[in-house]
Amino acid sequence: MKTLEYYEVIEYPVITEKTVNMISTTNRVTFVVNKASTKKAIKEAVEKLYAVKVKTVNVLFDRKNRKKAFVTLKKGFSAQDLANKLGII
């Protein structure tokens, strides 16, 4: 399998009422990512593209067969600032 570039790993942010609530309460942002991407690749892509530090990455496949990544940011980095940068909030 070939390695993916940073912009190929992250497809788009998920914008729902639940994910917007998670931004403010748990400092977590949700992305739909490439199915071939790993947690390590997702972490590197988020850190390089958005200039933040990632604490954890959790992934799941939803019913629409999309791979979602729940990215928790480290203390000192705000998910709300990242959401503003992405145009979510």
What are these regions (language model features)?
Residues 1-89:
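Contiguous, often N-terminal, cationic amphipathic patches that form binding interfaces
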